[in-house]
Amino acid sequence: MRAVVQRVSRGVVTVGEETVGEIGHGFVVLLGVGREDTPDDAAYLAEKIANLRVFADENGKLNRSVLENGGSVLVVSQFTLFGDCRKGRRPGFSAAAPPERAVELYAEFVRRLAALGVPTAQGRFQEHMEVLIVNDGPVTLILDSRKLF
């Protein structure tokens, strides 16, 4: 499972004219589910993201988590995080989980975040979305549950 985690002052997802997810300060997480992923991958990333210390404390040091900072997380499915661009000019997506499996693990990730006490909002799985991300910093991190990077 892969996640691009962006610290934001605001995040909004719309589908057509409908706003389906919106947060103030916190994280926008673009989440990709891999073919080999399990619920353990969802649990690992949820715990890691909930406790990442990338928010400033009273001394300006990046020492607080989204939980400690009172933030929220907007989760957006993003199968293209498993795109393989090593050959040719068109990415291959064979490493991404099939949609019926990916939606289960995406939902598990969101459930795990919420169980840790993180307020969450979501995009809409397998829909064309417009995502507004107002970066704060910017602070952007790339995480992989298999610790590949």
Swiss-Prot record:
Its EC number is 3.1.1.96. Its main location: cytoplasm. The keyword Ribosomal protein does not apply. Keywords: Cytoplasm, Hydrolase, RNA-binding, tRNA-binding. SUPFAM superfamilies: DTD-like. One of its GO terms (cellular component) is cytoplasm. GO terms for molecular function: D-tyrosyl-tRNA(Tyr) deacylase activity; Gly-tRNA(Ala) deacylase activity; Ser(Gly)-tRNA(Ala) hydrolase activity; tRNA binding. One of its GO terms (biological process) is D-amino acid catabolic process. It catalyses: glycyl-tRNA(Ala) + H2O = tRNA(Ala) + glycine + H(+); a D-aminoacyl-tRNA + H2O = a tRNA + a D-alpha-amino acid + H(+). It is found in: Cytoplasm. It holds the Pfam family Tyr_Deacylase. A Gly-cisPro motif from one monomer fits into the active site of the other monomer to allow specific chiral rejection of L-amino acids. An aminoacyl-tRNA editing enzyme that deacylates mischarged D-aminoacyl-tRNAs. Also deacylates mischarged glycyl-tRNA(Ala), protecting cells against glycine mischarging by AlaRS. Acts via tRNA-based rather than protein-based catalysis; rejects L-amino acids rather than detecting D-amino acids in the active site. By recycling D-aminoacyl-tRNA to D-amino acids and free tRNA molecules, this enzyme counteracts the toxicity associated with the formation of D-aminoacyl-tRNA entities in vivo and helps enforce protein L-homochirality. Belongs to the DTD family. This is D-aminoacyl-tRNA deacylase. It comes from Desulforudis audaxviator (strain MP104C).
